[in-house]
Regions:
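N-terminal Rossmann NAD(P)H-binding glycine-rich loop of SDR-like oxidoreductase domains
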Residues: 14, 22
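Residue(s) in the substrate-gating loop at a strand-loop-helix junction
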Residues: 129
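Substrate-binding pocket helix/loop in short-chain dehydrogenase/reductase
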Residues: 85-86, 93-95
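Rossmann-fold cofactor-recognition segment
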Residues: 44-56
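A short, exposed helix-loop element centered on a Lys and neighboring polar residues
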Residues: 109-110, 154
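Active-site helix of classical SDR
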Residues: 109, 145-148
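C-terminal beta-strand-loop-alpha-helix "lid" module of Rossmann-like NAD(P)-dependent dehydrogenases
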Residues: 161-210
Length: 271
């Protein structure tokens, strides 16, 4: 860690969980650089214009931050959600979802890791989701991006542990943020009679659950504890008791028993 204030780079810091993390860590004494496409800042932390979808933007952003000193920690929180049935989503829409949520994270990691190694170590938090552990109907490509992130984070943790870099996957359930309002709908959704009723019900359920979810500050508090822990966990879930119970049930129940419970919870009908 740096001899002065610990320095953290947070992606997706303009809103939602990323912004909450920036505010929380700044209040706790961290030197925060919050990256987003707009470079938004607030209350004393530094804003950085950086688009995780763009190789050169990420390279320039990380290089610029490193010019002022080492990066002690990374919180990779940039992401968004695509709604629609699998067959409704175009390949370009699906690729765009993975581009930000998965490949954007990879871009930042590949720029930050060499500097962390040279500095003797660091902490990395990858913002996953309960949707990276349980497939969410009508958000299949969002779930795919988070399932991919789970695999990446687990493998990465093994690779960099001998180098003094600790990796934690933080897995929030429903969180009350502007993620709900910014969810994108697949263009082919309009006029589709096959999935219309089920999609409308599923999105409505998502929105209600998110509106009643935990505040983003709860996730930020977990992120801070992970970054400041002497022995950070490999995974940390955040959410209401029912969501955490669902994750436990997936690990412990036979598949068919879990599937029946999940269908009921997700409002999925069967024939």
């Amino acid at each position: 860690m740096s001899s002065g204030a610990r320095r953290v780079l947070i992606t997706g810091a303009s809103a939602g969980i990323g912004r909450a993390c920036a505010e929380d860590l700044h209040a706790a004494g961290w030197a925060v650089t919050g990256a987003s496409r707009r470079g938004t800042t607030s209350g004393g932390w530094t804003g950085l214009v950086m688009d995780v979808d763009d190789d050169e933007s990420v390279r320039a952003g990380v290089t610029g931050m490193l010019a002022d000193g080492p990066i002690d920690a990374l919180v990779a929180s940039a992401g968004w959600g695509l709604a629609g049935a699998v067959e409704q989503c175009t390949i370009s829409e699906a690729k765009a979802q993975l581009e930000t949520n998965f490949w954007g994270c990879v871009r930042v990691l590949q720029q930050v890791l060499p500097a962390m190694r040279a500095h003797g170590g660091g902490r990395i938090v990858l913002m996953s989701s309960i949707g990276g552990l349980i497939g969410i109907p009508f958000q299949a490509f969002y779930s795919a991006s988070k399932f991919a992130l789970e695999g990446l984070g687990e493998a990465l943790a093994y690779e960099v542990a001998p180098l003094g870099v600790h990796v934690t996957l933080v897995e929030p359930g429903n969180v009350k943020t502007d993620f709900t309002a910014s969810r994108r709908m697949a263009r082919a959704v309009d006029g589709d009679a096959v999935y219309s009723a089920a999609l409308t019900a599923a999105v409505g359920l998502m929105e209600r659950d998110e509106e009643n979810g935990v505040p983003a500050a709860d996730v930020a508090a977990v992120v801070r504890r992970v970054l400041e822990s002497r022995r950070p966990p490999r995974r940390a879930s955040v959410g209401k008791a029912g969501e955490r119970a669902g994750l436990l049930a997936k690990r412990l129940l036979p598949f068919r028993a879990f599937e029946a419970a999940a269908k009921s919870s997700l409002g999925v009908s069967t024939r």
